[in-house]
C-alpha cells in the first residue's frame, strides 16, 4: 500500500503543476497574483478588440502612387477592402462623402452630368432622412450611393453587433425606399479594424477607402476653386480613388475644371461598378 502511495504522489504533484495555470486564470486559486493575471488577460483582449486603423497617406509626386502605412494596408487588403483602382490603367474614380447637405450637391450633380462622369456618394443615416430628392437624382443619373453608416460613429469602438447594425439598418432603410441594396461602404473618419472589415465582407460590401483626400471639409476656411483645382490635380495618379467632401464650395466650383484637367493629362474616369 505504501509503495503504491509513493508511486501515486509524483503523478498527483505533476497533475497539479500542469493544472496550476488553468486554476489560476479561472480564479479558482485565490491571491493577488492570480487577480492581477486575470485582469491582464481581460485588458489585453479588450485592447485587441478596440484596435483602430486610422487611414492616412503620404502623397506621391508627379503621378507616383501614394504610400500608406504597411500594417494598415495589409489589414485593409486582407479584409477585402481597397484604396486604389488598377494602377496600370490611367483611370481614376470620384467619390464624395455626404455627412450632411450644405447646398452644393445639386451643382456637383450638374457638373457630373455635363461631363458624363459617374461617382460614388457615401451617405449617412441623417443624410438619407433629409435628402430624398437628391438621392433619387443620384440614382436616376447612374451614380452609386454608398453606405457611410447610420450614425457616423467610429466603427472600431463598437461591439460586433452594433457595428453590423450601423451598416444593416441604413441598408434596410435605403432598400425600403429605393428598392435596391448598397454595394460600397466607407467607414466614418477612415477608422477601421479587422472586425469592421470582417463584417463588411460578410455583408457583401466592398470597403472603399481613398488614395487622395485633402482638408476640404472645413466650410469656414475654404480657399477658392483655384486652390482646389491645383491641390487635386497635383495628385492625379493611375488608379486614383479621389475623396471629396460635397460640403465644400471649392469642390463644387472646381469640379468641372478638375475633370477637364484630368482628361487633358490623359486620364479618364471609371465607373463605380469597376471597383466591386
Regions found by a protein language model. Name each.
Residues 7-9, 29, 153, 191, ...:
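Intrinsically disordered, low-complexity segments enriched in polar/charged small residues
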Residues 53, 89-92, 102-109, 113-243, ...:
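Metal-dependent polysaccharide deacetylase catalytic core of the NodB/CE4 family, i.e.
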Amino acid at each position: 500500500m505504501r509503495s503504491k502511495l509513493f508511486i501515486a504522489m509524483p503523478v498527483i504533484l505533476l497533475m497539479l503543476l500542469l493544472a496550476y495555470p488553468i486554476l489560476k486564470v479561472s480564479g479558482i486559486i485565490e491571491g493577488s497574483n492570480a487577480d492581477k493575471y486575470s485582469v491582464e488577460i481581460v485588458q489585453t483582449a479588450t485592447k485587441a478588440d478596440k484596435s483602430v486603423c486610422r487611414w492616412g497617406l503620404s502623397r506621391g509626386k508627379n503621378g507616383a502612387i501614394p504610400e500608406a502605412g504597411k500594417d494598415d494596408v495589409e489589414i485593409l487588403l486582407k479584409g477585402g477592402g481597397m484604396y486604389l483602382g488598377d494602377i496600370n490603367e490611367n483611370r481614376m474614380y470620384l467619390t464624395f462623402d455626404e455627412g450632411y447637405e450644405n447646398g452644393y450637391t445639386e451643382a456637383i450633380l450638374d457638373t457630373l452630368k455635363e461631363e458624363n462622369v459617374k461617382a460614388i456618394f457615401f451617405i449617412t443615416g441623417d443624410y438619407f432622412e433629409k435628402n430624398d430628392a437628391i438621392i433619387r437624382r443620384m440614382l436616376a443619373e447612374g451614380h452609386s450611393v454608398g453606405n457611410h453608416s447610420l450614425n457616423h460613429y467610429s466603427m472600431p469602438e463598437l461591439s460586433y453587433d452594433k457595428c453590423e447594425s450601423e451598416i444593416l439598418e441604413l441598408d434596410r432603410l435605403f432598400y425600403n425606399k429605393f428598392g435596391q441594396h448598397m454595394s460600397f461602404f466607407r467607414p466614418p473618419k477612415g477608422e477601421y479594424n479587422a472586425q469592421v472589415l470582417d463584417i463588411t465582407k460578410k455583408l457583401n460590401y466592398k470597403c472603399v477607402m481613398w488614395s487622395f483626400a485633402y482638408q476640404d471639409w472645413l466650410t469656414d476656411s475654404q480657399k477658392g476653386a483655384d486652390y482646389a483645382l491645383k491641390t487635386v490635380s497635383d495628385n492625379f495618379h493611375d488608379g486614383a480613388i479621389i475623396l471629396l467632401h460635397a460640403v465644400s464650395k471649392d469642390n463644387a466650383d472646381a469640379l468641372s475644371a478638375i475633370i477637364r484637367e484630368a482628361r487633358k493629362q490623359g486620364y479618364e474616369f471609371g465607373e463605380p461598378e469597376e471597383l466591386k
